[in-house]
Amino acid sequence: MELVVEPLNLHLNAETGSTLLDVLRSNEVPISYSCMSGRCGTCRCRVIAGHLRDNGPETGRPQAGKGAYVLACQAVLTEDCTIEIPESDEIVVHPARIVKGTVTAIDEATHDIRRLRIKLAKPLEFSPGQYATVQFTPECVRPYSMAGLPSDAEMEFQIRAVPGGHVSNYVFNELSVGASVRISGPLGTAYLRRTHTGPMLCVGGGTGLAPVLSIVRGALESGMSYPIHLYFGVRSEQDIYDEERLHALAARFPNLKVNVVVATGPAGPGHRSGLVTDLIGRDLPNLAGWRLHPVWRSGHGRGPEPARCSPRHSTRAHPCRCVLSQRRLSEGTMRTQFNPRIPSHE
């Protein structure tokens, strides 16, 4: 049978029963993938014509047809098919692994946010903006975005206290320096596109600052010189953290503009009052033609929830973060499963 891959206009021979990812990899077609078990959502692609058998963990229909999004590692070929994959400048392949680590610091960032630092036994490569699952105990496992870069001496996660949250309660009240943890990843498609040339808009609220900080640092330290507009939104002055780090970056890199926005109560010196989305609308009234990277918000469930970028979305009820950069429009999602099957153990 034939598999057509757009926008590359490739015509590939394939065997019935093969997964899309197997066929793409065997033909050296560039596509991002990570866990290879249908959990991370990295190998997402779209069906243009034909049907596939979808074995994904969340699928509600075994046959996926025109317009459906599937995971290449879980979609099985049953007939001639045409698919669309992300453009090659968005490809990243960091095979997911399990790496042991040791907690080296648990710092109080705010009254309800802890900054967790972990020293890994072995390096873990990831792209800025990706996330990993952290296993504190067999019963305490959650996904968190990396706040740093793979070149950092330690891995950093920012964890917010969730009322009634089993894992955050453990982190705040039981976890101690010296504890052993397991890091599974990297996962996710909301990573920095390094080949992009154009301005970026980055928005983070609460612990949504973590992946935004990773992306902004990755962009700046790799030499990207176009304007980067960073908006950090909080409910009140007591929720602000990492401000010194943000302004230190802005002092080093003049193309970075930092806005700290306080939604309720008086704003302190150098801060702005109101909703982040309203201020963005006034500061940047025309975002036509800007490129949209995956957008998500931190919910109170098991993991990141997909979210749409809209003027009134999620600034108060949920921390949110988004990254936009000028040019084309693309869209991605992050999976909500918190315990992916990772093939290798270290």
From Swiss-Prot:
Entry keyword Flavoprotein: yes
In this protein, which residues make up the domain named 2Fe-2S ferredoxin-type? Answer: 1-89
According to the record, the signal peptide region is none
Residue span(s) of domain FAD-binding FR-type: 96-193
Q: Which cofactor does it need?
A: [2Fe-2S] cluster; FAD
Statement: the UniProt record of this protein carries the keyword Flavoprotein:
yes
**Enzyme Commission number(s) of this protein:** 1.18.1.3
One Pfam family this sequence matches: FAD_binding_6
Q: Which GO terms describe its biological process?
A: catabolic process
Q: Which UniProt keywords apply?
A: 2Fe-2S, Aromatic hydrocarbons catabolism, FAD, Flavoprotein, Iron, Iron-sulfur, Metal-binding, NAD, Oxidoreductase
Record-annotated residues binding [2Fe-2S] cluster?
35, 40, 43, 73
What molecular function does GO assign, one term? 2 iron, 2 sulfur cluster binding
- Cofactor remark: Binds 1 2Fe-2S cluster.
UniProt family annotation: Belongs to the bacterial ring-hydroxylating dioxygenase ferredoxin reductase component family.
What is this protein for, i.e. what is its function? Component of the 2,4-dinitrotoluene dioxygenase (DNTDO) multicomponent enzyme system which catalyzes the incorporation of both atoms of molecular oxygen into 2,4-dinitrotoluene (DNT) to form 4-methyl-5-nitrocatechol (MNC) and nitrite. Ferredoxin reductase catalyzes the transfer of electrons from NADH to ferredoxin (DntAb). Also able to convert naphthalene to cis-(1R,2S)-dihydroxy-1,2-dihydronaphthalene.
Q: What is this protein called?
A: 2,4-dinitrotoluene dioxygenase system ferredoxin--NAD(+), reductase component
Gene name in the database record: dntAa
